[in-house]
């Protein structure tokens, strides 16, 4: 199973740790980088402003993604050094440093390292560490968002294998990028270690800077009458600016911004196959069924006639950005009439909404609200507390068996922005749900209630398309513990 969760779920065995960090010369090259007029992508702008605000308030920002897996043998430090530098030099998402003009949060300045050969990551031996020390090390040695080198790499050596990890600020990567890092590092290192070649020969990948330029060019062409803008305006009106959030209390995170994850099994292998069959029969795909179940679960707590939600969509352009590391994922709106719907009706509506919303992925909601002007006065863009429901079919990842064999996982730092996010993942032999939330008693109780409703929604999707309401409500409001919950 591909792992997804909190850093506490990462269990590297004890061993000597080597970490690759930017050399002093590379950091100097970033500080002296040429100022660029290219505006960062909207995804980056949101994250940079959140980092600036958190820093000004003296708070920590949830930001780090730890990508880790196992590799056989004794790590060849020379080969790994060449691999890491080749990876960083060929992905220009790593080549930019951002700061704010005279401390003003409205003006983001990009400084560029024009010559990738100036980037040099060098290994440092940190000695033997146990599991907890390794996790702390991976988090604390990676610089903050507003520093250029907010990405580090490392290995933990064992008797017959080693653990590789990348600790990267979300500024530079999204969920898909985690898999790209795996393929880049794993395959390049294996080639160098086995061939004895001195340098990695890495093919060219598309520029993330080019993506940002295309994004802003597209946004500049939008007008109030653009269909995508009108769709965002309609969604904002329908929600009255009360953007989708978790339907139950989670407490305030201003005092305690610790975060955690839970993972539960939704369906076993047979149940997963049956769920797909039910979705097909309803005229939907698996993704539509997933969103329908999320709508049904939320309905138990809100009672609203229509579900409004956000889901993630990858904006990479096929054959252009498919292998590019960067933050491409964006949120799109989902609308599902749910009050009197059967599962089949809800699944069809969710699928249609998802398919229609894909065109909105390239249109930042911030720009739509700007164009709407007085029509939506007083409505602000979604905050970090907006809830996302994401679906991933891990079976469709190229060479998915390699992920399984290597124990691949993606882990987040143990911080929270106060919101709740949900990932529903189809594994080789089951379907799981992973949910992130503030680490406090109120949020934990609410998450247990929500997951109970979600589990029952999936169960009744495969067993019956009617009569789910009473049973889901009964389970959602019970004090029963959840089976199969893992941290």
Identify the function of each model-found stretch.
Residues 77-88, 139, 182-186, 276, ...:
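Short amphipathic alpha-helical segments
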Residues 2-12, 126-129, 137, 145-147, ...:
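Active-site-proximal acidic secondary-structure segment that organizes catalysis
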Residues 98-102, 155-159, 424-428:
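Short, low-complexity Ser/Thr-rich regulatory SLiMs
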Residues 1-50, 54-63, 95, 199, ...:
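Acyl-thioester-dependent acyl-group transfer interface
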Residues 1-56, 82-126, 204-259, 481-487:
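Short amphipathic alpha-helices and their capping loops
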Residues 24-40, 59-79, 145-166, 251-316, ...:
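Gly/Ser/Thr-rich phosphate-binding loops and adjoining beta-strand/alpha-helix segments
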Residues 97-98, 189-206, 233-244, 446-487:
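A short N-terminal helical cap/helix-turn-helix that marks the beginning
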